[in-house]
Structure formats: C-alpha cells, structure tokens
Design a protein with these regions (language model features):
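Aromatic- and acid-rich polysaccharide-binding/catalytic face
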Residues: 417-441
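Aromatic-lined carbohydrate-binding surfaces of glycoside hydrolases
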Residues: 160-161, 170, 191, 201-209, ...
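Bacterial Sec-dependent N-terminal signal peptides
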Residues: 1-25
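Generic recognition of cysteine residues
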Residues: 8-11, 27, 152, 190, ...
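Mature N-terminal, pre-catalytic/accessory segment of carbohydrate-active enzymes
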Residues: 20-289, 385-388
Length: 441
C-alpha cells in the first residue's frame, strides 16, 4: 500500500533550547536560573509593559472561562465576557478542551486549582484520571511570519520584534505566584473514557489562592453515544520527527542510557497519544548537517575493516526502535538519510583506529559500493528483527535526479525496500515511493 501524506513545515520534535548555555538565552539575556531547569522555570521579562490606566479598575482577581482559540497576552487585559459555565461536547474516547483565564490587579501568592467530581443525573461519573489541567506558560518569540512567506532560513534578528506569547502547558507546576497586573491562563482537558455512559456530566474547576476559593468555574461534559477508537487505531498518518539527542542534552544524561530512556518516555508517550505512527531513525551522521540545535548522530555504527570490507552495528538503532515501540509507536520506521545535506559519510576505520569521512554522491562508484554493502546488511538485520515490512529508507528535500540515482542503489541492494521522501512532488518517481510527503502552499 502506498502512502501520500502532506508535509507540514514544522519543527522537529524534541525539547526546545528554551534557555541556552550558561543560563542565558541565545540573544545573551540572563535567565537568572540554571541553564537546564527541570521542575519549573522563570519566564523571561515581557517586552510589553502593562497599562496603568487599563489595570487601575482591577482591584480583585477576576476569573472566567475564555476560548481555546486565543493566546491571552500576559500583561494585557483579556477582551472577553465573563463566563462561569462552559459546555464541552465529545465522543467517548475523544479529548475536549477549555481555557480558564485569571487576571489580577494585585498579587496572588499561591494560585492553584482542582476539580470536583463529575456526575450525571443517574449517578454515573467520569474518573479523576479523565481530567488534567496545567498553567499556560509564556515564552519569547518574534514575528515568525512577518514576511508572509512562512519559510525557514536565515533571518536578520533586528528586523523582527520580540514578544512574549502563551505557549507551553505546564502540567508539572501545581501552584504558582501571580504578580499584580498579570494574566494567567489555565488549560483544562477531559479525555472522555471510551467506557463512559452517554449523558451530561456536571462538575467544576475550583480556582484558589492557597486554601481560599477565588472562583468556581462550572463545566459540563456532554458525552455522545459515538466512540472514537484509541489513537493507535486512527487512520491519520501522523509523522512528527523525534529528536532523542535534544532530550539527552537538556536532561544532561548519557545518550541511550536508561536515564535517557526514562527522560524520553513521558514525552514520547504524549506523542503516541496524539496518534503518531512513525519512528524517526538515522542511518548516517548529521543527515541534516547542523540545521537543528542538536544535530542528529547516526544510530548505526559503520566500520571499514582492515581488509576493506564493511561491517555495521545496530545496537543503538535496536534500542531506540524497541523503546519507541514500547510506548506505542510501532507502525513505521523512517530511516534517514542516504542523501544527507552534506554528502559526507562518517565511518570507523579499523586500519587506523580512527573516525574518517568519505565524500561521495549518488551516481558515483564509491557511493554505490558503500551503500549496497550497508543496505544488504541492514535488510538482513531488519528481517531477523521482524521489522523489514514496516521500515522505509527515507530522504528529505532531495532533487528528482538525485532520487532516481539513489533508488537504483536501493533496488540493487534489496528491491523490496520501501522508500519515503519528504519534499517536492515529482510524478516521475511517485510510483517508486511508499510514503510521499509533499509541500503544499
């Protein structure tokens, strides 16, 4: 079966370098905290100051349901009509969301929240595990799409203004201090159990300052008789690339250690719960050069023996794939890349006991000799592991003529290999591709 999916120009999945090295941002602004905060973190100062005139009338904390379609500014009064009840409708197995908004003219020292029980008229209830909430935190950004091109590439920082925007949902932080003249949203989610009895369930979000109730926000969940399958059963072909290397750096743990896997598990479980289908694996060193903050290492060790033949070790590759499968992502493995952005291939040279690089390109004899050896070995290994049928040799944004030369090498090594490409559409090679992610717009 062939897959044709849409390639969205989004960031690779991983932990963003929210705070750069030595406790400063990449612009050099001190963060006033360790360079890799884990449990919580201090937000950067807002370039936009609150308006004394606008905030003068806010003498006590105000709390209301807002809309999930708005990112509320941290120091600007929210433009909304106060609402103490909101109703969410969903199928069994569906996730429904709401956003509560707190804004205060005076300091709230210990803002926290909790849920009441949610029951219908017949006494049926939704489990506590169905509900979760988190403070929405603010991060620094700039005018990302100011030129309207929506593209990546070099940007002159002076041409783009900085601003603080609501972005991550912090489910680790259970309470926080809210300074005067500040907006603090709370994101609420109900993952309706598939076993829930259809009906209307009523409950509330309790917003407090310490033990003092500030506001009860009533919430109704209307559960349909229809049922959404589990994320692993969704037909939607979701492919968000993962970066295990970024996680290792941020959490300061050795690559591929048990500590590394433990740090990644909650992140990759969230990805699995979103319906992710594909494991991102790497066959070569720096397949995208240094494009990302943490460049990608190879998950396969290449060794050129003293007699000139090739050998390959798949220990890291196996550990990564088995880990991802353990969190529920197990339908496809995309392996990058036979055509890295810089056509330089790293290997361990047994004769000199050192790492070396060979520069070669599709269409050259050295390229074919090296990759036929690798893919022949890789095919054998995948078949032994039982993964061959879900594995694809993947490339990213490569020209058609380069792809045609590369496809010849793949077919020579094993004509049954699936091939994936993320890039522009070329009708000439479309029949040869199993998973084709194309750019739109």
């Amino acid at each position: 079966m062939k897959r044709l999916t849409i390639y969205c120009l989004t960031c690779l999945i991983g932990v963003s370098p929210l705070f750069a090295q030595q406790g400063v941002t990449q612009c050099g602004t001190p963060t006033g905290q360790p360079k890799f905060p884990i449990e919580t973190y201090q937000e950067l100062p807002d370039p936009s100051s609150p308006s004394d005139k606008d905030w003068a009338a806010v003498t006590i904390p105000q709390i209301s349901w807002g809309t999930i379609d708005t990112r509320y500014a941290k120091h600007r009064l929210p433009q909304l009509k106060k609402q103490q009840l909101t109703t969410l409708k969903g199928w069994r197995g569906e996730r429904v969301n709401a956003q509560a908004v707190v804004w205060t003219g005076t300091e709230v020292k210990d803002l926290n929240f909790s849920f009441t029980d949610f029951k219908d008229k017949k006494g049926n209830s939704l489990s506590d595990e169905a509900f979760k909430a988190g403070f929405i935190r603010y991060v620094m950004t700039d005018e990302l799409n100011k030129d309207g091109r929506g593209a990546c590439g070099h940007r002159q920082a002076v041409d783009y203004d900085s601003l603080l925007v609501a972005d991550p949902i912090d489910t680790n932080l259970k309470s926080m201090s809210v300074p005067a003249r500040t907006v603090q949203p709370i994101w609420v989610q109900c993952w309706i159990p598939q076993s829930a009895t259809p009906g209307t369930y009523k409950g509330a979000l309790l917003v407090k300052d310490g033990s003092r109730l500030l506001q009860q926000l009533n919430l109704e969940i209307l559960v349909s008789s229809r049922e959404l399958p589990a994320p692993s059963e969704w037909a939607y072909h979701l492919d968000l690339w993962q970066s295990p290397f970024a996680v290792a750096r941020y959490y300061q743990v050795p690559l591929w250690s048990q500590e590394h896997l433990d740090a990644m598990r909650p992140l990759m479980k969230m990805l699995a719960d979103a319906g992710q289908k594909i494991i991102t694996a790497t066959l070569t060193h720096k397949p995208w050069n240094g494009q990302t903050e943490d460049y990608f290492e190879t998950m396969v060790t290449w060794m050129k023996r003293a007699d000139g033949t090739w050998a390959f070790d798949y220990t890291v590759f196996d550990r990564w794939v088995e880990f991802m499968m353990s969190v529920g992502i197990d339908q496809q493995i995309n392996c990058y890349s036979m055509v890295p952005w810089e056509l330089s291939f790293q290997y361990f040279d047994q004769a000199t006991n050192s790492l070396k690089f060979v520069k070669t390109a599709p269409g050259e004899p050295a390229y074919e000799e090296m990759w036929v050896a690798m893919l022949t070995s890789f095919s054998k290994h995948l078949r032994e592991k039982g993964w061959f049928d879900i594995c694809a040799i993947a490339m990213d944004e490569r020209p058609m003529d380069v792809m045609q030369k590369t496809l010849k090498v793949i077919r020579k090594a094993d004509p049954e290999f699936k091939v994936s490409l993320a890039g522009n559409y070329h009708a000439e090679i479309e029949p040869d591709l199993y998973d084709y992610c194309i750019v739109i717009g």
